[in-house]
């Protein structure tokens, strides 16, 4: 009998705990009264507002969420969303007022306080109030030291101010929070160290610059500008062999960006009295990447400088099918044709390959925000992300290219 009573008491305690937990999940005590958390979400305005928000219809979302908030003025999450929407519409002052009013609530939890401060920091950053935004993000980190969003925004603000050491310090904190789960951390750390090296380089401190560039490469072997800059520092220090070693490592580590080192290597090989090394380099790259147009273009320019214009023209026609829309190739072809006296046969070969080509001046595009640029940029000026530019190419099929080359040869 005693055992049965004991089991009954345990069961009753479990049921009571479950009921209390459900009640705590649904209701919240605020200002001496219980608030039904579900009531807010059951209003049609709340759901409509979220749907409009998903569809990026900001004005309609604001209207519906304002209606939803009117049924319960204490709804923290809706007030936060409304403030953020005001910011997205450019109404920064209104967003700041909403979020500052939320901070006046005496019953905010630490987590709620941190996220309202985060929203306020975003308001200030959007409005260009740099100092106040920095202060807000730093206050978030006092409450929540592992808040990744605050850390990222703090890093970006330091980058905007070119405070690279501070940006690096904050990104290292982000990397600790991520604990190796995000490979872009190492990439960004590498680029930030490269920027620190560039600051030393401009200040004339070659030794410190070289250390920073080497550290950037150690952190992420694909930090392409660090190889270029390290080679430049070594060249200024009189270490031409070391400079060549750095530039050649770039081609091995990041072959798609190796063309940045072509002019440097061509000059360095010539200074060593071994221009044939550049020809060999280009031929190896062409062999390793049959569709690579940049090594072909570089080799043609090298041959033109040596007076071998017809051989240079042949390499240009080889490059063209792999990148028919690249303006640089066409400009080089016309310069070479000019030197060769505009021979009709050469012009016919060129016309056959370019019949459907479209030229453009900004072939590089950011993968994140689609910003276009005439040159490859290491950091996007619009979304401020690192190493997001790729070359937009509209190459034709190998079969068509091969057929056209065959026709050209018969012509």
Task: Tell where the protein language model's regions lie, with residue ranges.
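Start-of-helix register in tetratricopeptide repeats
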Residues: 43, 77, 111-115, 149, ...
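Flexible helix-coil transition and linker loops at the boundaries of alpha-helical arrays
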Residues: 33-36, 103-112, 176-187
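Short coil turns that delineate tetratricopeptide repeat
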Residues: 73, 107, 111, 145, ...
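Residue at a conserved register position within TPR or TPR-like alpha-solenoid repeats
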Residues: 52, 86, 124, 158, ...
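Alpha-helical segment of the N-proximal tetratricopeptide repeat
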Residues: 38-74, 81, 87-91, 97, ...
């Amino acid at each position: 009998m005693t055992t049965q009573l004991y089991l009954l008491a345990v069961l009753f305690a479990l049921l009571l705990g479950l009921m209390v937990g459900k009640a705590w999940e649904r209701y919240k005590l605020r200002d001496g009264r219980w608030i039904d958390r579900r009531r807010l979400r059951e209003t049609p305005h709340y759901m409509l507002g979220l749907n409009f928000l998903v569809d990026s219809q900001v004005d309609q979302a604001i209207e519906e969420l304002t209606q939803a908030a009117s049924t319960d003025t204490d709804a923290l999450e809706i007030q936060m969303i409304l403030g953020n929407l005001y910011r997205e519409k450019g109404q920064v002052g209104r967003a700041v007022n909403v979020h500052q009013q939320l901070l006046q609530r005496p019953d905010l939890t630490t987590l709620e306080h941190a996220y309202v401060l985060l929203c306020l920091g975003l308001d200030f950053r959007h409005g260009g109030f740099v100092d106040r935004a920095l202060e807000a993000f730093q206050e978030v980190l006092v409450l929540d030291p592992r808040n990744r969003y605050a850390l990222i925004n703090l890093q970006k603000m330091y980058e905007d101010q070119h405070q690279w050491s501070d940006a690096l310090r904050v990104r290292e904190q982000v990397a600790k929070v991520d604990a190796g789960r995000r490979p872009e951390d190492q990439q960004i750390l590498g680029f930030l160290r490269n920027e620190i090296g560039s600051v030393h380089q401009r200040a004339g401190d070659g030794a410190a610059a070289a250390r920073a560039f080497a550290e950037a490469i150690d952190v992420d072997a694909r930090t392409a500008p660090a190889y270029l800059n390290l080679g430049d520092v070594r060249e200024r220090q009189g270490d031409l062999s070391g400079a060549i070693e750095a530039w050649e490592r770039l081609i091995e580590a990041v072959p798609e960006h190796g063309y940045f080192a072509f002019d440097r290597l061509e000059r360095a090989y010539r200074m060593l009295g071994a221009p044939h090394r550049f020809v060999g380099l280009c031929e190896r790259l062409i062999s390793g990447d049959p569709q690579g147009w940049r090594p072909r273009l570089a080799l043609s320019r090298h041959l033109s400088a040596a007076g071998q214009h017809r051989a240079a023209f042949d390499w240009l026609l080889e490059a063209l099918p792999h990148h028919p829309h690249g303006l640089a190739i066409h400009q080089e072809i016309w310069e070479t044709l000019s030197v060769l006296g505009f021979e009709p046969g050469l012009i016919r070969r060129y016309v056959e390959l370019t019949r459907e080509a479209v030229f453009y001046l900004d072939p590089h595009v950011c993968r994140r925000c689609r910003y276009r640029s005439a040159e490859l940029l290491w950091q996007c000026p619009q979304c401020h992300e690192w190493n997001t530019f790729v070359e937009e190419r509209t190459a034709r099929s190998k079969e068509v290219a091969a057929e056209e080359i065959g026709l050209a040869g018969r012509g």
